[in-house]
Amino acid sequence: VLRVHNRVTDLYNQPMNQLEQQLRLTVEALRERQEHELINNTEFGLLHNADLKHRLTTRTGPPSPLDLDDLLSRRRKTRFFLAHPRAIAAFGRECTAHRVYPDTTVVDGKRVLAWRGVPILPCDKLPISPAGTTSILAMRTGEDDSGVIGLRPKDLPDEYQPGLNVRFMGVSDRAVTSYLVSAYHSAAVLVPDALGVLDDVEIGRP
């Protein structure tokens, strides 16, 4: 629930619209939470919905080129890896130790590390255990390729952004206006080989 005192919007609305700025910050926080849920939610999160046949463990602990090759070999058209930034750093160290050099590629205008031409995208929502281990995801995406897809309602009342709406709740006797900001999201793995997980990736203690 976003609460904004009317005095704030009356007195401090220049040079920036205070309601719009507060709403922007609220939406950003919701999107961060949404990303966390898509990875970690026990019902629909990707970490909990990988088929056991497509869950691998590292050969020696740290994420090696051979480990990522194993992940790639389990599915066609892998679109990207998803890894914690510290796991990406650990993979870079292993590449150096094995005297191999990963590629780079451009995703949304930013240059990122890649392996066999597949981007390795950073995601700090992937958990790190107390023992200093994490997981790396590999996935094929899109309905046409029977991959991992995101789900959201097609239309929402008072829609502000796709899958997100803002509903006016009223004004209190203290002149505080309330808005209910809600995000609706889920994910689905259309066929088991669309998602693979490399577990027990050692990156050192957090």
Feature names for model-found ranges:
Residues 8, 32, 87-89, 126, ...:
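Short loop/turn segments at secondary-structure transitions that flank enzyme active sites
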Residues 1, 5, 95, 154-158:
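Amphipathic, alpha-helical segments enriched in basic
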Residues 38-45, 82, 95-100, 138-143:
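A broad, low-specificity signal for short, low-complexity segments enriched in glycine/proline
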